[in-house]
Every structure is written in C-alpha cells, then in structure tokens.
Design a protein with these regions (language model features):
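FIC/Doc superfamily catalytic core
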Residues: 1-199
Length: 199
C-alpha cells in the first residue's frame, strides 16, 4: 500500500510529515539504546528501521538496500551490487572510530558517507540526518534538548549541507578522507540548538 505524490500531493505531503515525526520518535528510542549500548548498537537493522519509517506508505522499497542504480545530481553513488559491502565498511568504520573521533567528527562522517553511498531508493537524506543526530548524541553521552533538533536545522540550511557534502566528495575523489567542512557545519548547528537552552 502506498500513495503517489502525483495523485494527491497534499495527502502525500501529510503522510510524509507524519512519517518524519514517527522517524524522530524512533530516533529518540535508538539514541536511548545507543547511550546504553555504545558502538555495538549502530548496525544495519537500525538504519533499515529509520529508513522504513521515513517512507512508510509512500514507497514500497523502504527499509532495505537498493537493488538498482540511482543518480543524485552529478554524484553517481556506488553500483547497487556494491552497496552491501560499502555499508559493512561504513558501519565498521563508525564502530572502530567510536572512541577515537570526536562526536562531531563521527556525526559528520555519518552524514557525508551515508549520502555518498546512497544505499536506499528513497529518503537517503532523511536517514542520513537521523544517523548524524544519533551518532552525535550517542557518542556525546546525552540526548540533546531542542525544540528544533539538528536534522531539522540541516533540512533548513541546505546550502551549507550541500557545500560540505561536495567538499568531502571532492576530497574522496582525490584520494583523501576529509570531512572537516561537514564537521564544522554540524558543530555550528549543534551550537545553535544548544544556545536555545543557554548551554
């Protein structure tokens, strides 16, 4: 069962917004588990769940890795036959660097790399923003307060987001892992979120 945007855009938009609210509720549960379990709680099952809830009733292929090509502007993500391997590497890199990288580094890497792989048919950006916040909170040891949390701030500040993605992509194309622009971007948005609470 799913709704097509072209059939009823208002209804589609309402379902999409409800899905986003449900994703944030699930994300909060995931963060609470991550605060107790640490790096072992970050796995593909959590990623599948976050993606599935984001596209429930608007896409038939939510919550599983894509099995077809996908194109994102000028970026060509890995071939679908390579997605599972790239995701294993991604998850392993997060887990192995959990206590090495700063929380903003871990979150920035997650935000960039998941977008670079683009493992899902739909809602890669929504899933990556949720993962970013999960990593930031779970690695920091706190569920940060906010009336407007980081994923919403990223969604509203697309220029900085897209610029940081492109910078990390260029570095990777040149043979370097450098997501420092993304880290600065994430840190700035977190500061703005915490400033609302005088933190």
């Amino acid at each position: 069962m799913f709704v097509l945007e072209k059939e009823d855009k208002d209804f589609f938009d309402r379902i999409q917004e409800q899905n986003l609210n449900r994703q944030y509720e699930l994300l909060t549960n995931c963060i609470e588990i991550g605060l107790k379990k640490g790096p072992a709680s970050f796995d593909k099952y959590m990623l599948w769940a976050l993606n599935h809830v984001a596209v429930a009733n608007i896409s038939q292929f939510g919550g599983r890795f894509r099995k077809e090509p996908i194109y994102v502007g000028n970026h060509i993500p890995p071939h679908f036959n390579e997605v599972a391997d790239w995701m294993d590497r991604f998850i392993s890199n997060i887990q192995e660097n959990w206590y090495i990288w700063e929380p903003t580094e871990l979150a920035a890497y997650g935000l960039w790399r998941l977008n670079w792989i683009h493992p899902f048919i739909e809602a890669n950006g929504r899933t990556a923003r949720a993962v970013c916040y999960y990593l930031l909170c779970a690695r920091s040891g706190a569920l940060f307060p906010g009336t407007k949390i980081l994923p919403e701030r990223i969604r509203e500040n697309r220029h900085g987001y897209e610029s940081a993605l492109l910078a990390a992509d260029r570095a990777w194309d040149d043979g370097h892992l450098d997501f420092s622009d993304m880290e600065a971007y994430v840190a700035g948005l977190l500061d703005a979120q915490l400033a609302e609470f005088g933190l």
